[in-house]
Amino acid sequence: MNHLTLRGTHREMGFQWGARLAERGLRLLDHVPFFLTAERRAFAAACHPAYARHFPAALEELEGLAAGQNCRQEDLETVLFTTYALPPACGCSCLAVSNGNGVFFGRNSDFLTALEPDYTHVTYGFSDRAIPFTGNTTSFVQMEDAVNARGLAIGLTSVYTPRPRPGLNAGMVLRLLAETCAAVPEALDRLRVLPLASCQTLTLADAAGDIAVAECSPEGMRVERPGPAGPFICAANLFHSDLAVPLPPGPFSGPLMQGSSQ
């Protein structure tokens, strides 16, 4: 696993990340495990306005990353904005336990295992108002799990998305919550108003001992809390709520491995 510590503005940290990889002769776009098809490019372009409205800092970081890698920002956006909405596979699992004596939070990452040598642990120290956090990613910018300086921990699992819609996907939503929210209720409130591109679960835990699983899809969100079985929650690659009711495929859910290449 790679380890990075980044400090500065979002754009500065994006440039740091891209430039450090470039110094080692590594190009992010050479390691993408799927083709950047016309379908993916169209979906990413449709998602761009949602990021400009709800998470403009991510676009600034991607601008810096593209400069550091000497590549097109559009190509990086195509990778990131479609990874969970149009996934090549689903993976990961999470759990959290809160028993009054503390919180235990765990996550297993088995998404895109072909990229395992490139997995990265990142610590972000922002020079603006964003909350510092440390997290893990199989790619770049988006995070699969994170713990921030306010004590909020979040982990995702991917769920098949029958009808993707333009919006923010799992890893980017998690990243946004990690740098803007201090507790589970605040994160859930923020999540309810975001346009979502993909289906996913988000397992959340905070310093007060509050834990929850948010089952999220473009159609809505359900929150699961600890039940009679004990003070724990868990999630894998499916929903337990009625969000799991099958839907017919949408316009962006066709074959993804065909068409134009990178």
Feature annotation, model-predicted:
Residues 1-71, 82, 99-104, 108-262:
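C-terminal, well-structured catalytic/ligand-binding subdomain of enzymes
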